[in-house]
Amino acid sequence: MSAPGADFDTERDLRAAQKAEVLVQALPWLERFAGAVVVIKFGGNAMIDADLEAAFADDVLFLRRVGLKPVVVHGGGPQITQMLAKLEITSEFRGGLRVTTPEAMDVVRMVLTGQVQRRLVTMLNARGPLAVGLSGEDAGLFRAQRRSAVVDGEPVDVGLVGDVSRVDPLAVADLLDAGRIPVVSTIATDEADPTQILNVNADTAASALAVALGATKLVVLTDVEGLYSAWPDRSSLVSLISAAELEAMLPGLDAGMVPKMEACLRAVRGGVPQAHVIDGRAPHALLLEVFTTEGVGTMVLPDEAAAGASSE
């Protein structure tokens, strides 16, 4: 604080003024989202960059401390690939899906629940002892049905891979009611064989969980700024899009963006008021999305809400 009568220090005092402006701007959003469930899909480069991972943990704990109810859902593709290579287990993708043999499934399970999740829980708990790890197989959280890939128009068996078909959110809801931060790894129990575990896509699992919890927001972290209408033209970043507009764009999107945007579409069509894709490479992007008027990335809204927002 400047002493009374002290000379104005431009750098110091403007920085303080900017911080005050940020706090003032955040207030209505703090009030609006008090008690709101926010499902965050953590992935991309933020999972393998220590500084970004630390910033993410700071953001999640901040959300919890100011009264929101964050739920973290994670995958672990790069870590799974690395471990499979280390163990000399063949790993290939068919039609965009990882071929998952029983041997590979053991590695998927080990990496997601024993490595990636443990690291996230540890980082969060270092900032406040609130995080609890859950697997999609715990308490019947995720059930899935096996699926195949499509290659050259033909179905191809990809092993122990499934689509989430049912969600029982009770265990997650109980943790939220207890003031905890659930950290969920995305494997699921096979609907047809409860003794078998399936590998499921983390984006679609996060979307299904957001719907089941009645979340206020789904936020998907990725490695681009958001959705582009004419990629790679960076000036074509879409800040707001309706569910109908997004559905029309899906067939022409880059393969890597399709599951993320489908997850957002399913979420808002399932009753989640807002879904977002944001750049996980930007430190504190999560806080910028939730607590600033401009937000970041791309926001997907139900058709009626998008029409109202566009006319404002």
UniProtKB/Swiss-Prot annotation:
Subcellular compartments:
Cytoplasm
InterPro entries assigned = AceGlu_kinase-like_sf (IPR036393), AcgluKinase_fam (IPR004662), ArgB (IPR037528), Asp/Glu/Uridylate_kinase (IPR001048), Glu/AcGlu_kinase (IPR001057), NAGK-C (IPR041727)
Q: Name one GO molecular function term.
A: acetylglutamate kinase activity
What's the family? Belongs to the acetylglutamate kinase family. ArgB subfamily.
Q: Which residues bind substrate?
A: 76-77, 98, 199
Q: What is this protein called?
A: Acetylglutamate kinase
GO terms, biological process? arginine biosynthetic process via ornithine; L-arginine biosynthetic process
Record site: Transition state stabilizer: 41, 260
Summarizing the function annotation, the protein's role is: Catalyzes the ATP-dependent phosphorylation of N-acetyl-L-glutamate.
Q: Which CDD domains match?
A: AAK_NAGK-C
Gene3D superfamilies with a match to the protein in the record: Acetylglutamate kinase-like
Kindly report the protein's main subcellular placement as a broad class.
cytoplasm
EC number(s) recorded for this UniProt protein: 2.7.2.8
Reaction(s) catalysed by this chain, per the record, are: N-acetyl-L-glutamate + ATP = N-acetyl-L-glutamyl 5-phosphate + ADP
Top enzyme class, one word, equals: transferase
* Superkingdom to which the source organism belongs: Bacteria
**What keywords tag this UniProt record?**
Amino-acid biosynthesis, Arginine biosynthesis, ATP-binding, Cytoplasm, Kinase, Nucleotide-binding, Transferase
Q: Which GO terms describe its cellular component?
A: cytoplasm
Pathways involved? Amino-acid biosynthesis; L-arginine biosynthesis; N(2)-acetyl-L-ornithine from L-glutamate: step 2/4
